[in-house]
Amino acid sequence: MTGHYSKTEHQYILLTSESASFDHYSVYRDPQLPQIFSHNFVQLHDTFPLERLLNFLPSVPKLLDANYLHLKASPQHVFPLGLKQSLVKSGFVVEDELLYDMKLSDWKGQMGHPLTAWGTAKSLSDGSSIMKIYDSIYIGEAIAEQKLKRKYPFYEADIIILVVCYSDQAQKVPIGCGELFIDHQEKTAKIEEVAILDQFQRKGYGSILVKEMLSIAKSLGMEAAYLVAASTDGATQFYEKLTFKKYERVHTVFHYFLT
C-alpha cells in the first residue's frame, strides 16, 4: 500500500500483528492467531526485484513460522504474464487486493440511521455476536471465538468502532456489523470486516451499514475513508455503487501446505 493510506493501514495491522522490516520486505505476524491469514503475511517493498520472487517464496513460511505462504507485492509491482503463469503452474494462488477510497468532503449522508447502532453496551454485545456467527461460517467456531477475544478490547475501547445493523427499527435482531478504524493523525478511516448474514444479503442492509460508517467517519473529522476488497469476492460492484473509487491494486500470492 502506498501514499496516504499506507500509514493508516500500518497502524491498523499493528493492533494485532508484530512487524519486522528488512531491506526489501516486511514481515507481519500475529503469534496469538497464526491461523488468521490477514494478520500474517510478508509485504514486499517497492525495491524488491521481481526476478527474485520465485526463489524468495520458499522462505516465506519460515518467516511467518506457519504452514502456509502469504505474500503481498508492492502496489508498484506488476507481475508479468510469465511470472503469473509460473506461479500458478507451481500451485500458488495469485489474486489481487483492490483498495477503494472516498473523499468525505462530498459525502452528504446523515448519521443515525434507525437500523444502525454503535457506541453502546448493547451494540457492542450485538455486534460481537454477529461477528462471531459470521466468522464461524468461514473459519470455524473455535478460531472465530479466538479472533473475537483478540479484537474485543479494541472494540470496547473504541479504538475500533463496531457498527451494528438490525433487521428493523426495534433493534432486536442484529443481522450485520462492520469495523471502523479511525486514524486521527492522518484524518483517515478504514472500513473493515463488513459482514451481513447470508439470509439478509442483497436487501439493502449492507448499503445502510456502510453509509452509516461513512457518516460516522465524517462526523469525527475524517477527510477520507478506504477499504480493501478481494478482486474475487463479488463486492467490488457494491462498493463502486456507493461511489468508492478504485485507488490501487496489489498482487497477492498464497499457498497452504498440508504437511
From Swiss-Prot:
May be involved in maturation of the outermost layer of the spore. Keywords: Acyltransferase, Transferase. Its EC number is 2.3.1.-. It is an enzyme of class 2 (transferase). The keyword Transmembrane helix does not apply. This is Uncharacterized N-acetyltransferase CgeE. Residues 110-259 form the N-acetyltransferase domain. The keyword Acyltransferase applies. Signal peptide: none annotated. GO terms for molecular function: acyltransferase activity, transferring groups other than amino-acyl groups. InterPro entries: Acyl_CoA_acyltransferase (IPR016181), GNAT_dom (IPR000182), GNPNAT1-like (IPR039143).
